[in-house]
Amino acid sequence: MAGSVMVDSAAVSSIQQRPRKALAYAALVIVAGVLATTLAQSQVLARLPLQNLLKNELHADRTANAAFFFWAGLAWYLKPFAGILTDAFPLFGNRRKSYILMSATLAALSWLALIVTPHEYRKLLFVVIVINTFMMIASTAVGGYMVETAQATSGSGRLTAIRQFIQQACLVINGPAAGYFASIAFGWTAAACGGIMFLLVPVTILFLQEQRKRLDSREVFDNAKRQLVKIGTARTMWAAAGLMALFYIAPGFATALFYKQQNELHLSTQTQGFLQLIAGICGILAAVGYGISCRRLNLRTLLVWCMLLATAANLGYLFYSSMGRAQAIEGLNGFGYTLAELALMDLAVRSTPAGSEGLGFSLMVSIRNLALFGTDWFGSNLLDQYHLSFDSLVVANSATTLIAVPLVFLLPRLIVSRKDAEIYRTTTNRP
């Protein structure tokens, strides 16, 4: 689509004239968007019901169960390129509103289609991949709208805080809700996810205001090309990406743990959901603690101690033999693992090249997602095909994570030697 075309963009002029009202409207769209594209994911609210269906109805082993979610998330691994496409190719005259309305509607309809999909592995997987494709596009468009609005209103801090709060709330809601849905007919899960996704449609129609703006699609692609070249030569970013990959590439045992909870501890799905609730609450406490610590400690110190704590918490799964221990271990792991994730995401933000923040950060998150779901599949395969014990898998996971810790000291001093507050003062004091 060469040449200049008329497209819709965030109504920058009207936002600047009525900043409070515009920011409130934008916040409503972002809240609905983050809620819908987070909670209604097959890897979030529908994960426990789907895992339960695959294990107990289709009698899938751990490898097949983990593989299902790896391939189900295929679209999310390609999210950075969706951002380039939605920026360059307007849909019905705009880049945000139409993409959100179309993808949210199609995602909701796809969830409803899943209700009548035969309970066969490949057919279920195909529909879930379609669902995630539409949800990923909606998430990309909502994210682009948030950035656009934040730039126009100088409200990046407030909008980011809203986004983070909604995501954490989704994690807390997910545990008991997913546990309950897994205990009843799967159709209710699909209907609930479809309903949550469709909430985004009326909110977008009512509150997302756009006006026409001239955009040269060739310029967008040229800019994307420049960003890709810049990212490809960003040694600091790739060093950080290497550390993240090593941390996440440890053989995963999320699916193996699900089977252990049901087969050995004989937990119901509602009890499994309660354990997720404990982990989610402890994760929120970790986020609060990290927010305080990052202004007092430099990133190198945070990375080392957070990754060590995550490793220690991981070893707790060696003692996962009763409900009481499970509660304590899930809480400890929710706290420790969240701290490590926050430190690594902090590293990702700092190491992304200036001018390529969105694409660079998305690429690093995609690397994280690909490694996370891929290693869960790998870990499950080790148990099923090579008869590795669960405890051996836990030790292998912890050892691989521990290897990543010394590499923190090889990261460029520029990005790890400062505290969060020092970075802010340095940025604001630039001439």
Where are these regions (language model features)?
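Helix-to-loop junctions at the C-terminal end of transmembrane segments
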Residues: 78-94, 182, 286-299, 383
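Structural signature of the two symmetry-related core transmembrane helices
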Residues: 97-112, 301-316
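Intracellular juxtamembrane helix-capping segments at the cytosolic ends
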Residues: 137-151, 339-353
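Juxtamembrane intracellular "pre-TM" segments in multi-pass secondary transporters
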Residues: 8-23, 209-240, 431
